[in-house]
Amino acid sequence: KDFTAIDRLCYTGKRGMGALEYVPASSEMSDIDENINVSEMVKFASDVLNQRKLITLNAQEKLTYSQLVQVGSSAGGARAKALIAWNEKTNEIRSGQLNIDEDYDYWLMKFDNVAKNGDHGLEDVPEYTLIEYAYYKMALDAGILMSDCRIYSNAGENHFMTKRFDRIHGKKVHMQSLGAMAHISYKEPRLCSYEMAAGYMREIYLPMKDIEQFYSRMVFNCVAVNQDDHVKNISFLMNRSGEWRLSPAY
């Protein structure tokens, strides 16, 4: 209750989605450029969600993991996730907050088998991440544009990964959600219809093919009973010429 909007922005600092950065940041960035232990990240996320007082990590690990593991903060969403850099050739994972070489790409990882993970007071079933991956495959078959998604298997767990579309060749891309642009809270249902969303898209001069893509997503969400289609899950990307485009679905 004491965590204000300003506190959240200061906590986000330079680690948020998109290109916006907030100063002064309330926490220092970890500059440790080393491989990340996925199992330890999952354990840390479970400890946070369980509100355990004793987390069995040393001070540096706590700093590193607390900046990587996002629980409903800068990466958005209700479930624990991490912003990572992944080397597909070696399968190594490093912090997604650091500048990385060309062998690494930026990804967002949603954890499997995290205690107390879920939304609206409901705890996820085991391997919920595989269900999300199945929806990704169905969306592709339906012509929905999405970033590359993978399943990262580790120690018997299957973590869902999606490649970040707000990072291109290591550079930040300006991104805003419909909720942020239209000042609409995703927590209040029925404040924004698909028709209203399309109207906002016309106001920022999205090309017609983006409007058509948005219509396809609307149909897919209805048919596939995806009820997570709120205003924070509709976003736009701006290029350096100031032109907006509909982001990939997520």
Model-assigned labels for residue ranges:
Residues 1-250:
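Phosphate/dinucleotide-binding and metal-coordinating scaffold of catalytic cores
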